[in-house]
Amino acid sequence: MKKPFYITTPIYYPSGKLHIGSAYTTIACDVLARYKRLMGHEVFYLTGLDEHGQKIQTKAKEAGITPQTYVDNMAKDVKALWQLLDISYDKFIRTTDDYHEEVVAAVFEKLLAQDDIYLGEYSGWYSVSDEEFFTESQLKEVFRDEDGQVIGGIAPSGHEVEWVSEESYFLRLSKYADRLVAFFKERPDFIQPDGRMNEMVKNFIEPGLEDLAVSRTTFTWGVPVPSDPKHVVYVWIDALLNYATALGYGQANHANFDKFWNGTVFHMVGKDILRFHSIYWPILLMMLDLPMPDRLIAHGWFVMKDGKMSKSKGNVVYPEMLVERFGLDPLRYYLMRSLPVGSDGTFTPEDYVGRINYELANDLGNLLNRTVAMINKYFDGTVPAYVDNGTAFDADLSQVIDAQLADYHKHMEAVDYPRALEAVWTIIARTNKYIDETAPWVLAKEDGDKAQLASVMAHLAASLRVVAHVIQPFMMETSAAIMAQLGLAPVSDLSTLALADFPANTKVVAKGTPIFPRLDMEAEIDYIKAQMGDSSAISQEKEWVPEEVALKSEKDVITFETFDAVEIRVAEVKEVSKVEGSEKLLRFRVDAGDGQDRQILSGIAKCYPNEQELVGKKLQIVANLKPRKMMKKYISQGMILSAEHGDQLTVLTVDSSVPNGSIIG
């Protein structure tokens, strides 16, 4: 019997309308839930809303309604969106649910009694929008008065911070730091994709894991601490516990918790909240003596050509506008096909419409149309019996499908959807090629080979049946439409799937309907841009014709050949320390793909007072500079590249998934 499978999205913070970023996470979890069900697992899929906090209280006040009314309205809208996206969740939790609040209060008192929570005072820079405290060194930008004193700043998210000093209860994270590191070593695959775990250890644990403020007294919209009700439980204990309370943890009926928490547990989150799920959540589970989840998947973001989505930029994409215009399946397909594992993906209207036309309409839609039409034309709509090796091309088609099915399952288990879909489209491409190879229109002539023609039709129908099965977790409507045109019932099982299993004496529809009509590229691209509020960018505007401009450079112009002599590589920071006797220099040990680490000295110490935040980062370095001796005793082999504007300096980094030693250029 297969283990029960538990999959969760993060619970979303309902302070505004959800865009395709939240839709991505929810669809990604839905795809996995549907796949696991088709593979024979009992699945519990959880999503929901994180409804407490200062920002909600403020938003409600601005709207002239109570916080409860505000979150009730938001919950209604979010549920409607998930219905539109056909999300097959088993439970929608809200942190304002009575059962959840009762368990949160009880857990807080339990941890207080066992001295894992203690009362203290917190002072620090706080972002209301992020519901998070920051140290000065973590701020993206620092504001100072005329005396040089810090008076404010900007969080990494871009939101402004304010100084907060108040009595607070603290969670003893520091007590569990060694145990957490040991857990990471035992379970190196716990955080995916690879590289994310090292970021957490280097950036947050090795510099010294600080205890976490877990209560607030400056607002009231939250779960009151029973023994000290002027405090409300701060967001992360409240929010993270949803994964357990939704299953019945701490309640009279805990059958689902006993079943699914002891099965396979997967959490999927955006990379921006990985720290809370990879550090706070495991430690909270340790405090409660509960088993650890099996996998924590931190995906990248969908961004636009001009950066993150922003209403002010006119580049926000909401799922409703795409579903209403193009249908649900193209959106689900595009989101799952276009975001590389471990990296960010770029949304463009051109790419969206292009994938519909070329991959869905041309590749898949035309294959179905041609197959159904030929079976009707040559065999009166009845699919001939499947036989092996009826033509010289059957064996290769079968081998390709078997190999791609194995790849598909491997990538689905790894939650690598782009590669899983690539395997499916390899089957589709090979089947389209099979039509050209076998030339059924020639076999159908009077002097043709009817037995070979029958084998071709059977193989085409069988291949499409395979495709309909493997796309079902992604595109339910398309899968059902293909099966219906082939005369088959909807897909209900994926655990056993073979090309030769096409049912005998099956009759296809008399006339197939295109499942993806071709789109007018220009018109549909303009539609998306207009919906995004980017009316200035539609294609009717005068095309930009670039002209040669006068170069504004602080240095002499160089030739391409001169630049080509410079080798820029990706290098991971293994260690960094201040250089004794110098206020400017930092000493780096980096892995630049040389087979052994190299040392680089860089004069950026004043810009990085907390130099340990650079450990684990992947930087860009000039790798082929002639080594030079510095401070009489250090050899520096390379240069760390940075961007400088005014008195601000930032080292240039790359995504953590890029291998060390990769050439940039």
From Swiss-Prot:
Report any Pfam family annotated for this entry: tRNA_bind
Catalysed reaction per UniProt? tRNA(Met) + L-methionine + ATP = L-methionyl-tRNA(Met) + AMP + diphosphate
Q: Which GO terms describe its molecular function?
A: ATP binding; methionine-tRNA ligase activity; tRNA binding
Where is the protein localized? Answer: Cytoplasm
The answer to whether the entry has keyword ATP-binding is yes
Keyword terms: Aminoacyl-tRNA synthetase, ATP-binding, Cytoplasm, Ligase, Nucleotide-binding, Protein biosynthesis, RNA-binding, tRNA-binding
GO CC field = cytoplasm
Q: For ATP, which residues are the binding ones? A: 311
A single GO BP term for this record reads: methionyl-tRNA aminoacylation
Q: Motif 'KMSKS' region: where?
A: 308-312
The first-level EC class reads ligase
Checking SUPFAM superfamilies in the record gives: Anticodon-binding domain of a subclass of class I aminoacyl-tRNA synthetases (SSF47323), Nucleic acid-binding proteins (SSF50249), Nucleotidylyl transferase (SSF52374)
Motif 'HIGH' region, chain ranges: 12-22
All copies of domain tRNA-binding, residue ranges: 562-665
- Name the Enzyme Commission number(s) assigned to this protein: 6.1.1.10
Query: Is-annotated flag, keyword Transferase?
Result: no
Recorded family membership: Belongs to the class-I aminoacyl-tRNA synthetase family. MetG type 2B subfamily.
- Could you tell me which PANTHER family the record lists for this protein? METHIONINE--TRNA LIGASE, MITOCHONDRIAL, METHIONYL-TRNA SYNTHETASE
The UniProt function text for this chain reads: Is required not only for elongation of protein synthesis but also for the initiation of all mRNA translation through initiator tRNA(fMet) aminoacylation.
Q: How does it assemble?
A: Homodimer.
Recorded protein name is: Methionine--tRNA ligase
Organism this protein belongs to: Streptococcus pyogenes serotype M3 (strain ATCC BAA-595 / MGAS315)
Q: Which gene encodes it?
A: metG
